[in-house]
């Protein structure tokens, strides 16, 4: 069945971005059916010119599911921090430069190379999750490359969203070119 031939199974029979079904539930007392913005409490918000939110992401070449196939990710994974050209120019950072990242919430530091790209908005950074920054003490020599980059979870506070319990994977850091 397609919605064109039969109505959706929502209370209105139409596509709903948020279901008004929630409004009629006893547990929905004092809950607005419409989404609203609430600033996150999972991390400190950037204030200085060299402070950024890192949005972490995944793809088929860099996620926890491919850790079983570690060696191929040496060639397909990206262990760099992506930065918008506007921010890079302002901070004097060029493609391939190494930066030090320091957590705003946790006293953690790491280093990574920078990819300057328009694929990330100004004022934020991007890093693939699970793609680098391994800190295991003993590694086979052919796997030393897994130490490259950072693991964004180093900087995460571990705070979860009260409504649904999901953890924040985005973090805030202070950066400097090294």
Segments (PLM) and residue ranges:
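Long, low-complexity segments enriched in small/aliphatic residues
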Residues: 1-71
